[in-house]
């Protein structure tokens, strides 16, 4: 399958490349920690458990197997809402993975109100890719500035943008 072939999003699922990239950027933290935005996080960047309970900094550590379970549950919920938001829209597998990763990182509500989604619905794929670069702020800090302490967020956005553009040019 070509990296540029587009399919209805309803028929796609997160690829192995999605999970590899997720682990690359989120890593494994078996103990709760505060993420760049100050939110309690555990495992592979999870802020909530399967039942919707928020991670607390005082939660007990988990093992790697449990980290994967929690992340898969989070991704599964995100995917359902993601596919629904893209009814009738065709995307390449790479785009599906990129935007799902965005949702995992920034949340469903940010996705639903984003210019990425409106551009995709309008068939403006390159504009949707470019919209990724607008998302460079965390806790009012510009993450494209290395000294702001959130540069990894920007690096991840640039990676998403590059992958997305690769599927569209």
Residue ranges, per PLM feature:
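Small-residue-enriched, tightly packed secondary-structure blocks
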Residues: 38-40, 44, 96, 100
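Generic structural motif recognizing short loop/turn segments at the entrances and edges of beta-strands
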Residues: 29, 36-40, 53, 58, ...
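Acidic/histidine-rich, surface-exposed loop or edge segments in extracytoplasmic proteins
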Residues: 45-63
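Mid-length scaffold segments of soluble, non-membrane domains
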Residues: 60-115
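Long, amphipathic alpha-helical surface segments
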Residues: 1-11, 17-38, 46-48, 65-73, ...
């Amino acid at each position: 399958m070509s990296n540029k072939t587009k399919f209805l999003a309803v028929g796609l699922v997160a690829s192995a490349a999605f999970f590899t990239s997720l682990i690359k950027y989120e890593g494994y933290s078996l103990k709760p920690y505060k993420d760049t935005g100050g939110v309690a996080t555990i495992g592979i960047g999870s802020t909530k458990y399967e039942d919707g309970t928020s991670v607390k900094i005082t939660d007990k550590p988990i093992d790697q197997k449990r980290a994967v379970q929690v992340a898969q549950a989070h991704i599964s919920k995100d995917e359902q809402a993601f596919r629904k938001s893209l009814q009738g829209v065709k995307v390449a597998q790479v785009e599906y993975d990129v935007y799902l990763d965005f949702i995992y990182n920034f949340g469903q509500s940010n996705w639903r109100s984003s210019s990425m989604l409106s551009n995709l619905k309008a068939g403006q794929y390159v504009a949707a890719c470019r919209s990724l670069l607008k998302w460079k702020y965390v806790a009012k800090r510009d993450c494209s500035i290395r000294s702001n302490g959130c540069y990894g967020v920007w690096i991840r956005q640039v990676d998403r943008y590059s992958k997305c553009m690769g599927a569209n040019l």
